């Protein structure tokens, strides 16, 4: 049975997020569309035969690189040129098929070609369904950091088919679980409770739960809960100036680690480490008790996600953290100040922290505290 969500963007337009079979995609092609560019990753080429049934529409295929290697200016330029060479107009359509990197890149291409061409996202990974494809953020990477170039551009439709997740490997599932767990910490604690209860039933002798053993109905329930969290926050703050930034929980260190390690860490692995780090910072500042920090570590470790950073020196991380978008705005949402901190831009960074489960806020933290929290994550 189809389930539908509506997301209001910065304009009067509404993006529909549909949970239905991918074979229904042609029901949602805008009238007047003459050409469709299918931007796909090699890992999802099995979706392509669906588009061979198109009637009255000319379909083009464009293979893009897998994972973060897709999010480069050179790749975006090649896509723009392909669109131009094949005479795509504003009345035509892009369809992206793939993971989070596919929607980030294709959304950016769609937002900038002819200053805007319609796009439908078909996320084929868990992280795509619960995060990357929803909300209208697009982005490509620079050597100086992740997602430093991008736009806010809402897709026409996001079509999610959970049956496509049955072929995902363990690592891709774990990456998506990290984003689902994040939603549990920042808004919906029932997500954490569901995962903890499931762990009691499926834990192996190593005290771990294989993500591939998650019952399909349970996984779909978690997907809907995470999507609801994201829609709630994006609906009230499409341009990411306040409440939507709570979705960035764990991402300040995560993006820095991804860049500093040349994306050897997956996004989900980095977010997992980043959430534990944010909890460590909040604990160091006396905002949360050790029980909440321990809960972060326990649930993430149980599902096979890392809680300790790789061996990356702090001085190699701080330049990326200072470029975090939250540092560009005066958006503290709490009056909490550490009297020992000197409010200088060069000595502080803004993070999303917790006062409690489902009680996030944004505040400035001194680099002294940030370093101490980072060092505390390594085994003594």
From Swiss-Prot:
Localization terms from the record: Cytoplasm
Cofactor requirement: NAD(+); Co(2+); Zn(2+)
Enzyme nomenclature, EC number: 4.2.3.4
Top-rank taxon, per record: Bacteria
Catalysed reaction, written as an equation: 7-phospho-2-dehydro-3-deoxy-D-arabino-heptonate = 3-dehydroquinate + phosphate
Swiss-Prot/TrEMBL keywords: Amino-acid biosynthesis, Aromatic amino acid biosynthesis, Cobalt, Cytoplasm, Lyase, Metal-binding, NAD, Nucleotide-binding, Zinc
UniProt pathway annotation: Metabolic intermediate biosynthesis; chorismate biosynthesis; chorismate from D-erythrose 4-phosphate and phosphoenolpyruvate: step 2/7
Gene3D superfamilies per UniProt: 3.40.50.1970, Dehydroquinate synthase-like - alpha domain
Molecular function via GO: 3-dehydroquinate synthase activity; metal ion binding; nucleotide binding
Any one Gene Ontology cellular component term annotated for this protein: cytoplasm
Keyword Amino-acid biosynthesis: yes
Positions of NAD(+) binding: 100-104, 124-125, 137, 146
The keyword Nucleus is assigned to this record: no
Disulfide bonds: none
Pfam families linked to this entry: DHQ_synthase, DHQS_C
Cofactor remark: Binds 1 divalent metal cation per subunit. Can use either Co(2+) or Zn(2+).
InterPro entries given in the database record: Dehydroquinate_synthase, DHQ_synth_AroB, DHQ_synth_fam, DHQS/DOIS_N, DHQS_C
Any one Gene Ontology BP term: aromatic amino acid family biosynthetic process
Binding site for Zn(2+): 179, 251, 267
Annotated function: Catalyzes the conversion of 3-deoxy-D-arabino-heptulosonate 7-phosphate (DAHP) to dehydroquinate (DHQ).
UniProt family annotation: Belongs to the sugar phosphate cyclases superfamily. Dehydroquinate synthase family.
Protein name: 3-dehydroquinate synthase
Organism: Tropheryma whipplei (strain TW08/27)
